[in-house]
Amino acid sequence: MFRKLLVILLIGLAISCHPKLNPIQQQIQSDINRSEVFKNNFTGLVVYDPVTKDTLVNINGSKYFTPASNTKIVTLYTALTLIPKQIEALRYMTKNDSLFIKGTGDPSFFHPFFKDSTLYFFLKDKSTITLVKGQLDDDHYGPGWAWEDYDAAFSAERSALPIYGNVLEVIHTNGVTQFTPDYFINRSQMTAFSMPRKRANFTNEFYIPLRENDTIQVPFIQSDTLTSRLLSLALNKEVRLMPPQNDVVFDQKLYGMSRDSLLKQMMVVSDNFIAEQLLLNASSTQLNRLNSRDIRRFVLDSLLSDLQQKPRWVDGSGLSRYNLFSPISMVQVLEKIQQNSEHYLEFFPIGGETGTLEHWFNGTDQPYIYAKTGSLGNNFNLSGFLITSSGKTLIFSFMNNHYTQPSSVVKKEMGVVLRRIRDDY
């Protein structure tokens, strides 16, 4: 009898000591468990109230996920913290009548979207210009990037001094074809047929489909020699090349366009090239060298040393499947952005209105989702800020990996969960 009573007491004690889930956690957990869509996914969701410091929902929050372009959230934080409001566009030294220059990774020079000409107007009146080569202390491609994407616009090469966004842009309208830069006209074949590839694998030979009212962007293979040639043609004067020398010290800086304008483009349309180059620019600013690996290590060891789960962070854009982040870590980075930027919502796509969220997660009367998407094959993630019906701003990270159904199905089911959080809290 005594033994039975003891067992009953122990069971009661265990039940009373077991942490109770809050109502929102219980409801969301139930929704996800019952969902046929999430049934075979690897799903993680963390919802956090930055005012009360309460974690409202935590489902697999400490597990690692492939973040895809959610990685750009960490690049955003890095750039906001390390890059000045006007981006450093060039470093240079003047000696007698000669100008020696090196790149800082600034992606804006003649970029197809920005078409920034700060560097052009700085250089056009200089008599003797020498580009010091060998400044990129990194690979042109990130680790784990898919080789088959080499001719895709979203996979442009990284470089020390980008020009034209490191892509050939071909616009065909009303029977007229325009090449930018036109240096590649004689290296391009126009074809009425669809070719397997738009560029040769190891050379800058292009195969451009001839389609009316079409714009095509194809990455070109970067080199210091090509950069000096394109600069020479743009400036209509010779730009020489030389290796680094000890007596050439880059003691002056040229500042270019607004950092925040670049960041908004990176986040809203999920521009991989801008993300990669801003990471290199942060490296130039902080470490005086262009090395993506070194600046990531610096950020993880200093600015993000308090993350609960140390990420595996291998590039600036999220193109690599080697990246691994937990939902909790993503929420922590988002909170840092919120704390350090007064206009933080302006950097994020708006549900139902802009960028990668233009057709998804729209509100009823007004937007309620401001978040970054992250898409790779079989993966879709959404991390950012959720405005509840009661007016509270929550931080969330909703990650879905390893599904086989269409992403549209997963997005719709995520919308059901996010609307419940909006309406119930």
Predicted segments — roles?
Residues V51-K53, K63-T66, G105-F109, Q135-D138, ...:
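Solvent-exposed loop/turn segments at secondary-structure junctions
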